[in-house]
Amino acid sequence: MRHGKVHRKLNRTAEHRKAMFANMCASLIKHEQIITTLPKAKELRPIVEKLITLGKKNTLASRRQAISEMRDLDQVKKLFAVMAPRYADRHGGYTRIIKAGFRYGDNAPMAVIEFVDRDIEAKGKDSGPTQESEAA
């Protein structure tokens, strides 16, 4: 029986899953849209929704909870300064998942997870080694 089995294991250990979702949350908040596999996107959605709700509370305790969940201080600052005011009047449903076909190598179902009222210019901003080398 599968009573109480709510989340997918995604063929990873608990530590690996937690680290992966922390990185994915930070990437989604930074770029406001990421492409990943459909099961990962479905598991990421409630984590990000709870982080946005924490950002809307805007207390010291909620900020510390967000830091412990995400471990990226720059993205926590963006969560509380930019994302939370943007969704102040929305009660849940901050993200959407769009199916994006199948991956070429292993035919895995792919999906785009993005914020509903996302900033178009945020995608690809400050990412990759070329951005860092040009700035230096």
UniProtKB/Swiss-Prot annotation:
| Gene Ontology cellular component annotations, sorted alphabetically | cytosolic large ribosomal subunit
Source domain of life is Bacteria
Q: Name one Pfam family in it.
A: Ribosomal_L17
GO process terms (BP): translation
**Gene3D superfamilies to which the protein is assigned, alphabetical:** Ribosomal protein L17 (3.90.1030.10)
Q: What keywords sit in the KW lines?
A: Ribonucleoprotein, Ribosomal protein
Q: Name one GO molecular function term.
A: structural constituent of ribosome
Q: Which InterPro entries match?
A: Ribosomal_bL17, Ribosomal_bL17_CS, Ribosomal_bL17_sf
Q: How does it assemble?
A: Part of the 50S ribosomal subunit. Contacts protein L32.
Q: Which family does it belong to?
A: Belongs to the bacterial ribosomal protein bL17 family.
Q: What is this protein called?
A: Large ribosomal subunit protein bL17
Q: What is the scientific name of the source organism?
A: Rhodopseudomonas palustris (strain BisA53)
